[in-house]
Structures are given as C-alpha cells and as structure tokens.
C-alpha cells in the first residue's frame, strides 16, 4: 500500500466501524476544497432556479450518501447508513432527490434499491434535469473546452450527452479526447488514499490527454476536479461544469477567471 498512512488504521477501523459510524470522517474535505465545493452548490442552485425547477433542502437532515463507505467495503456500516438516509428522506416526505455529483447519483439510484427493500424515491442528477429543460443561455460562452467524463456518470448512470448538450447550448466549442464518454479514462481518484503515487501517475496521464485537446478542462465530479487540478500545467484551467453553466445561464453570476 505504498506509504499511505491510512492503511495503518485498517485493522482498527474494521472493528470500530461495527459500533461507530465512520462515514462522516471518510467524507470530510479540507477547508479550501470545501469553499470551492460550496460555490459549486450555489452555482447548481442558481441554475435550477433559473430553469424553473422547484426544489427544497433538508439542511441538517441532508445526510451523506455513504459512497466512500461503500467503496471501502464496510458493508455493515454502509447498510446501516443507507437505511438511516432512506428513513430520513421518507420522514420528510421526499419523493425525488436531485443529486449534484456522480457518486451520490450512483449510490442513491443504483445501489440503494439493491439493499433497501421497497426503495421508491426518484433520483436524477441536476445535469439531467437541466438538459430536459433546455434553458437558453443569457450570456453565451466564447470558449473551447474538453470534457473529462466521470467514470461513474458515463459507465454506470448514462450521463454523457446531457453535459455536452448544456455546454454546446451555452456556446462552448467541445474538443473531445480519444478516451471520452463511456470510454473515459480514470482521474486517479479511487487510488488516492491507498496508492497516492500511482494515483498521481494516472492523473498525470489523463491530464496530458486533456490538455492536448484544449486549455480548459471541464469536470463533473469533485474527486476528478481535485486530482486533475493537482497535476494540471499552469496554462491549463480545470473547472467544474457548474462554473461554466452558471456563467452562461444565470444572469446574476459574475464571470470568474479561470480557476487553475
């Protein structure tokens, strides 16, 4: 496991997770990253409102999906957490969930129904909802971009055409890499905690593919964004798709400089 410190605690974690829910610790991000993610959430909220989507928010009752717990193979902890999340949603009368990232989309839409009997909540990514509404750009983009498709969105949830439709309608010119859509290449994120060296190697290879196509790279996943930004050359901007869409579709969004 290379030199990753987290592996020193796996044996302890296997025992502790039976009595303590560790999902919150696994999901925690750094303050700088958190500010970036918060801005992306504001972008998404503005986009949905501009498209006429009526939605609410559960605040403290908006629980983490448990995606990382699932990926780590902590089955008992994940199942208990999934039931907690589902019960919370049902107790608040939720019939449809709008997700903001690929991992949550996949866990709620494809995994929960397999482990929770009678799961009956509709789950859609905000990108799917926006693509259905086909909003008009109020401030068209004049930019050339390349898309890094999320492995989970593209291969498991069939979210491939929607982001392209939204970017094209926003005025962006898309330059596709050879490995795009369902043939997308990994950002290295799944390896980060156990094999940081290999993760950086994978991310660097992917970044080389992307930067050869365009100077602006569009991501749709916070893990992809973090890993690719870390290895991006100075002349390449790596930004979340919500940044571009908010600039084009939301009239009150200030145009921001490329976030490298």
Positions of PLM-derived features:
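Iron-sulfur cluster-binding electron-transfer modules in prokaryotic oxidoreductases
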Residues: 1-260
């Amino acid at each position: 496991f290379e030199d990753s410190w987290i592996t020193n605690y796996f044996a302890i974690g296997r025992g502790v997770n039976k009595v303590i829910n560790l999902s919150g610790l696994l999901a925690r991000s750094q303050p700088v990253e958190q500010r970036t993610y918060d801005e992306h959430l504001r972008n998404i909220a503005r986009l949905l409102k501009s498209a006429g989507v009526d939605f609410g928010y559960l605040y403290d009752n908006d629980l983490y999906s448990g995606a990382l717990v699932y990926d780590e193979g902590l089955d008992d902890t994940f199942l208990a957490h999934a039931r907690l999340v589902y019960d919370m949603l049902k107790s608040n009368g939720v019939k449809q969930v709008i997700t903001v990232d690929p991992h949550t989309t996949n866990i709620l839409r494809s995994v929960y129904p397999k482990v929770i009997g009678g799961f009956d909540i509709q789950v859609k990514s905000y990108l799917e909802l926006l693509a259905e509404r086909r909003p008009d750009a109020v401030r068209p983009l004049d930019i050339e971009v390349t898309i890094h498709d999320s492995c989970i969105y593209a291969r498991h949830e069939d979210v491939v055409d929607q982001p392209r439709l939204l970017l094209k309608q926003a005025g962006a010119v898309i330059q596709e890499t050879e490995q795009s859509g369902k043939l997308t290449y990994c950002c290295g994120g799944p390896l980060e905690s156990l094999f940081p060296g290999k993760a950086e190697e994978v991310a660097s290879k992917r970044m080389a593919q992307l930067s050869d196509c365009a100077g602006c790279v569009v991501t749709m996943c916070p893990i992809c964004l973090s890993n690719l930004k870390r290895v991006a050359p100075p002349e390449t901007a790596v930004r979340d798709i919500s940044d571009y869409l908010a600039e084009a579709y939301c009239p009150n969004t200030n145009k921001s400089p490329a976030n490298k």
